[in-house]
Swiss-Prot record:
GO MF term set: DNA binding; DNA ligase (NAD+) activity; metal ion binding
Annotated positions binding Zn(2+): 395, 398, 413, 418
Annotated source species: Streptococcus pneumoniae (strain ATCC 700669 / Spain 23F-1)
Gene3D superfamilies membership: 5' to 3' exonuclease, C-terminal subdomain, 6.20.10.30, BRCT domain, DNA ligase/mRNA capping enzyme, Helix hairpin bin, Nucleic acid-binding proteins
Name of the coding gene: ligA
Needed cofactors: Mg(2+); Mn(2+)
Positions of transmembrane segments: none
Keyword field: DNA damage, DNA repair, DNA replication, Ligase, Magnesium, Manganese, Metal-binding, NAD, Zinc
Catalytic activity: NAD(+) + (deoxyribonucleotide)n-3'-hydroxyl + 5'-phospho-(deoxyribonucleotide)m = (deoxyribonucleotide)n+m + AMP + beta-nicotinamide D-nucleotide
Pfam families found in the cross-reference section: BRCT, DNA_ligase_aden, DNA_ligase_OB, DNA_ligase_ZBD, HHH_2, HHH_5
Stated name of the protein: DNA ligase
Cysteines joined through disulfide linkages: none
Positions of the BRCT domain: 577-652
Keyword field contains Electron transport: no
EC number: 6.5.1.2
Amino acid sequence: MNKRMNELVALLNRYATEYYTSDNPSVADSEYDRLYRELVELETAYPEQVLADSPTHRVGGKVLDGFEKYSHQYPLYSLQDAFSREELDAFDARVRKEVAHPTYICELKIDGLSISLTYEKGILVAGVTRGDGSIGENITENLKRVKDIPLTLPEELDITVRGECYMPRASFDQVNQVRQENGEPEFANPRNAAAGTLRQLDTAVVAKRNLATFLYQEASPSTRDSQEKGLKYLEQLGFVVNPKRILAENIDEIWNFIQEVGQERENLPYDIDGVVIKVNDLASQEELGFTVKAPKWAVAYKFPAEEKEAQLLSVDWTVGRTGVVTPTANLTPVQLAGTTVSRATLHNVDYIAEKDIRKDDTVIVYKAGDIIPAVLRVVESKRVSEEKLDIPTNCPSCNSDLLHFEDEVALRCINPRCPAQIMEGLIHFASRDAMNITGLGPSIVEKLFAANLVKDVADIYRLQEEDFLLLEGVKEKSAAKLYQAIQASKENSAEKLLFGLGIRHVGSKVSQLLLQYFHSIENLSQADSEEVASIESLGGVIAKSLQTYFATEGSEILLRELKETGVNLDYKGQTVVADAALSGLTVVLTGKLERLKRSEAKSKLESLGAKVTGSISKKTDLVVVGADAGSKLQKAQELGIQVRDEAWLESL
């Protein structure tokens, strides 16, 4: 039976590739169904012989307990946004300072969910969400139900690829029709539907909803020398790659492509929200490098957001954790990008003055970055009142005088004991990107603060189970879970704590970078500003902010109290040792290694202080080669770059 099962799996996978990837089926649906039923019957009779790449794995049937966290071997960076021709010109100017004659590749920006797929020996072993770029959720079983994702590759490769998982418009309409018939709330848009589907614990639901993918990048070090060649290679491996793309020599060509795509946008079978522009040559990408958050060699042009008119009803002023006082407009409800919007940010007092926003104005509201509702401008022809908005002079939380510094656009409360700032700081500390204390959300934090059970973040770790029972609506089971979540967070790697402290200019990426170098928050607190500023991608502003924070007596006391309660202050990830053998060197791995997996070689190089990249450039210091190194070895020799082999790496 094994031979026939092999034949059926090979045939059905080939037909599926023709249908989903090539859009060129060679057999009728009825023939595919007949062969599929035959395979199901054989697998039912001989379950021990079911093959790893059998298409029956896609049908569903598993109910998952939840999704485990998964650390990305290769981080997923965000992209810098551009909203105008002028911003694209500025991007081009920055690139040309480093690259004399760049060629760009323009690809559609799919409005879906970023995914990472990892294959070992050609078999899909992990499908993961983007998460925060460093840690995502393992949704492998759900992604196996997406019919155009290959379960196996034609080669026994170890490879990680990136792409977007989305819901086609036709599938979206079908899903919403079923939900309507079942009396369930409809999804607002295809992106929300795709996100909700991938979060399903029942894989059978995923299988029914006909999600699709476009792959756009090999995340693991590529043997191709350009993005365009990389896309063609992904196609050869059986992935679906969006065919709508161009190579461009200048911004005029890019802008023409953007205008063309904008006109076709509504007729596409899937949603897009822009065009991604990348430097095509991978060596040039390497020269340009990254900021802390984004590659310097790419930009995402975003199409203008949908706009609607609404009437301004009133303005709320709220205090954030840094003391900035933000105005929020209350509006007559409008439908915007698939959701009902009744509140929108007014940004700050300078924005209100610049836009001359007055009481009862009719305003244009849109979603900034397709996410945050914001007031864009006033419809002056519909103005009904000349009365200006009331700008507060005192903090709405603590009644302290508000300040408006010359170099800032916002009002600010500088009272360190302001209740709103303290509470927002506690909420931030417990949030997912910081200490990730499950269940300790804004509602519970507000109740703890109101009951005077917590005044600073160290107090969180002094709480006992019985303290939670004092809060309205909290039962014994919830109290136990909250206490357990707090105890578990003590073991977090220290970059989570550093971000949670809410130091100005120190975000999650910066926190990780700092701890990679200084290994612990205690070491960082003793570092001088010159040492911090010398770290690549950081600078004087961050260094000064850290120096100011750690110079205060309060920070010293807080860190001591956190340590006394058992909170970990050490970094648990891969550190960078300043005096390591390869510290500060840029290294390229190429060719087939015989004894080490590529991931093992990369980890070892990084542990020795090296930055491992995929392309050879003038910034490359060393190339480690295996068998069949090919053009990269030749290029290294031409550039006079030092070359070492696998045995040398093992000896370190």
